[in-house]
Amino acid sequence: MSHLALKDLFSGFFVIDDEEEVEVPDKQQQVNEAPAKEQSQQTTKQNAIKSVPQKSASRYTTTSEERNNRMSNYSKNNSRNVVTMNNATPNNASQESSKMCLFEPRVFSDTQDIADELKNRRATLVNLQRIDKVSAKRIIDFLSGTVYAIGGDIQRVGTDIFLCTPDNVEVAGSITDHIENMEHSFD
């Protein structure tokens, strides 16, 4: 805002009209002139507002153009830093899928360690033979939810022994049928 525009704005507020200085002895005349005074004050304010210069629209268009140029330059500069996931995952996936963790939890709180290994895409074999049945059921419920969340699978491979696998591990076949046959052959 320029200096002159500010001066015009403030001078419009402090202008004294000749009509305002005249004293009116009659109350009837004061009542009639009160709306006239308000109207003259409103026109003074409107004139002061009109004297304020409007912001130009060209200022905003240059800003958006500059921003678009900066964003396009930014994306061009950073395009060489992008690495495709297909190139990065084969080595990592083969290393992660080759490791299997064995667990024999004694208390329910040990289940968190099993879930962490599953989240890190490692297969786990869980032996629940040394824990009470109620805790074993809670552990299986928890691991079933974990495996479901990561898109994996849980299978019973023996008496109170479970295989939990993440989505990058595929289990072919079923061991349960073989174990049942082996148990019956020893009887």
UniProtKB/Swiss-Prot annotation:
How the protein assembles, per its UniProt entry? Answer: Homodimer. Interacts with FtsZ.
User: What family does the database annotate?
Assistant: Belongs to the SepF family.
User: What is the role of the protein in this entry?
Assistant: Cell division protein that is part of the divisome complex and is recruited early to the Z-ring. Probably stimulates Z-ring formation, perhaps through the cross-linking of FtsZ protofilaments. Its function overlaps with FtsA.
Q: What is the lineage of its organism?
A: Bacteria, Bacillati, Bacillota, Bacilli, Bacillales
Q: Where is this region: Disordered?
A: 21-97
- Bias (Polar residues) ranges: 38-63, 70-97
The alphabetical list of record keywords is:
Cell cycle, Cell division, Cytoplasm, Septation
Question: What does UniProt give as the signal peptide span?
Answer: none
UniProt entry tagged with the keyword Transit peptide: no
Any single GO CC term annotated in Swiss-Prot or TrEMBL for this entry: cytoplasm
* Gene name linked to the record: sepF
GO BP: division septum assembly; FtsZ-dependent cytokinesis
Localization per record: Cytoplasm
Please indicate which superkingdom the organism of origin belongs to: Bacteria
Could you identify this protein by its name? Cell division protein SepF
